[in-house]
Swiss-Prot record:
Function (record text): Cleaves peptides in various proteins in a process that requires ATP hydrolysis. Has a chymotrypsin-like activity. Plays a major role in the degradation of misfolded proteins.
Gene expressing this chain: clpP
Organism whose genome encodes this protein: Lactobacillus acidophilus (strain ATCC 700396 / NCK56 / N2 / NCFM)
InterPro entries for the chain: ClpP, ClpP/crotonase-like_dom_sf, ClpP/TepA, ClpP_His_AS, ClpP_Ser_AS
Listed EC numbers: 3.4.21.92
Entry protein name: ATP-dependent Clp protease proteolytic subunit
Cellular compartment(s): Cytoplasm
One term under GO cellular component: endopeptidase Clp complex
Pfam families in alphabetical order: CLP_protease
GO terms classed as biological process: protein quality control for misfolded or incompletely synthesized proteins
Gene3D superfamilies (alphabetical): 2-enoyl-CoA Hydratase, Chain A, domain 1
Similarity comment: Belongs to the peptidase S14 family.
Catalyzed reactions: Hydrolysis of proteins to small peptides in the presence of ATP and magnesium. alpha-casein is the usual test substrate. In the absence of ATP, only oligopeptides shorter than five residues are hydrolyzed (such as succinyl-Leu-Tyr-|-NHMec, and Leu-Tyr-Leu-|-Tyr-Trp, in which cleavage of the -Tyr-|-Leu- and -Tyr-|-Trp bonds also occurs)
Length: 195
């Protein structure tokens, strides 16, 4: 993927940044694509860096992701909760699966979606092969992950646990408006100036 470069004029002349580094200067982190360990490490490093720079200012986490590895996503979520800076989450395009958990784990009152965003909640996916005991261990781990994800959704949305268990039984796609009604986000962001 070609990463755009931004040229800025400074007192010392021109300075070139890749677009992501330039956005980071404005405390904006882009989470796009599949969530995995490599992406998680990058997002965590950016969160820690911005928090160390100034923990009184918000960090904006823009999310456009189909989801991914649960442990990688939970590592990002734990870091969002660990740092002192408020983390504003904004869904752009798609916040599916683990990405929807990150979206709803933003600072209360600062969780947004753009009008045409889609949010997907569902139970964890997984697979196993090997001996029966190995398959049983993997199945138990998926059940533990499902319980943990449902508890997070319960805490962040205020929805009853029984409703969340039912709603995540299968893929549950929500529009931005439906995500707001469900409690996954706080507001639909029509334009940046209004929020």
């Amino acid at each position: 993927m070609l990463v755009p470069t931004v040229i800025e004029q400074t007192a010392r002349g021109e300075r070139a940044y890749d677009i992501y580094s330039r956005l980071l200067k404005d405390r904006i982190i882009m989470l796009s694509g599949e969530i995995n360990d490599q992406m998680a490490n990058s997002i965590i490093a950016q969160l820690l860096f911005l928090d160390a720079q100034d923990n009184t200012k918000d960090i904006s986490l823009y999310i456009n992701s189909p989801g991914g590895v649960i442990t990688s996503g939970l590592a990002i979520m734990d870091t969002m909760n660990f740092i002192k800076s408020d983390v504003s989450t904004i869904a752009i395009g798609m916040a599916a699966s683990m990405a929807s958990i990150l979206l709803t784990s933003g600072t209360k009152g600062k969780r947004f979606a753009l009008p045409n965003s889609t949010v997907l909640i569902h139970q964890p996916l997984g697979g196993a092969q090997g001996q029966q005991t190995d398959i049983q261990i993997a199945a138990n781990e998926i059940l533990k992950s499902r319980k943990k994800i449902n508890e997070i959704l319960h805490e962040t949305t205020g929805q009853p646990l029984e409703k969340i268990q039912k709603d995540t039984e299968r893929d549950n796609y929500l529009t931005a408006e439906e995500a707001k009604e469900y409690g996954l986000i706080d507001e639909i962001m029509v334009n940046k100036k209004s929020n």
